[in-house]
Amino acid sequence: HKNILGALATVAIFIAIVLMVYYRKHVNQSTFEFIIDMLIVLSILWAIYGIYEQFQIYHRLGVDHFTFKVYARRENRLNSVFYNANYYAMMIEFIAVCIVYKFFTVKNDLKRSIFYVVVGFLNLFMLYMTGCRAGYVAIAGAICLFLIFNRNYKLCFLIALGCLGVVGFFVLNPSKFPRIEYLISNLDVRMKIWNCAIQGIIASPLLGQGPFTYMMVLNKYNGHLTQHAHSVYLDPLLSFGIIGLALLVPYVYDNCKRLYKVKEHYSYIALVMGFIGVLLIHGILDYTIFWVH
């Protein structure tokens, strides 16, 4: 298919898989916990740079005061150290699940518990400022999944009620919802992207055409100009086909067995399920897991 960019991306994916296998073989519990804490601390640096970036945006637009208004144009949305605002938002979702995990696993350490709460609210604030609307649903769903698998049913119920309250607030005050004026037009764009992806899948259902297939077929099927199919359910099929995805079945099965062996460690299983929740919920409207970073 002359998909040179896709071939290079496949090499990058292979390198990432090698690193993942090495990590799984050598990491221990203390290293794992250190990595989680390191990511949480790094999120503070992301936020600091993101706030600086936001004030740079204000300066460029001639705004001389802080405002909660989130601008629609990509260049006027903060992305911190990531490729764009949506990538940053998804990293915040993962960090939020990590923070909830650490909050419930830290024992008899009030200072650390307060630290996790403060960093959690900082990241929620930054999520709002990214303007990524799918992020709100993904982070709520992922945290609820974590709490269910961690057997914190009452807290999950209370958070669900809180989410309903937030939904009610935005229903009564739609102007407060980030980029509300572009909601319908953005959904129309998504529909155009998905229709193009579906036609591409039908054209090559078994093997796909490799990473970045969407960029190769968008003109042929009158798609919207973008890098991918904006769906974790469509882009893998478009790029790798049914056979390509079937190759993941043994890996998924092996990981399910690994999880079953540690079923008594509720928090660890809850962390994994929270991550899966982020991917599957955010992935309805976007495909930010493609990139190695």
Where are the predicted features?
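Membrane-interface helix caps and helix-loop-helix hairpins in membrane proteins
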Residues: 1-5, 128-129, 178, 284-290
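Membrane-anchoring hydrophobic segments
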Residues: 1-22
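Membrane-interface micro-motifs in multi-pass membrane enzymes
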Residues: 3-7, 79-92, 133-135, 229, ...
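Alpha-helical transmembrane segments of multi-pass inner-membrane proteins
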Residues: 12-16, 33-66, 72, 80-149, ...
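A membrane-periplasm/extracellular boundary helix in multi-pass inner-membrane enzymes
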Residues: 33, 48-57, 130, 147-187, ...
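A conserved mid-to-late transmembrane alpha helix and its immediate loop/hinge
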Residues: 80, 124, 195, 224-259, ...
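Long extracytoplasmic/lumenal interhelical loops at the membrane interface
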Residues: 176, 181-195, 199-203, 207-240
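Membrane helix-loop boundary segments at the extracytoplasmic
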Residues: 240, 270-293
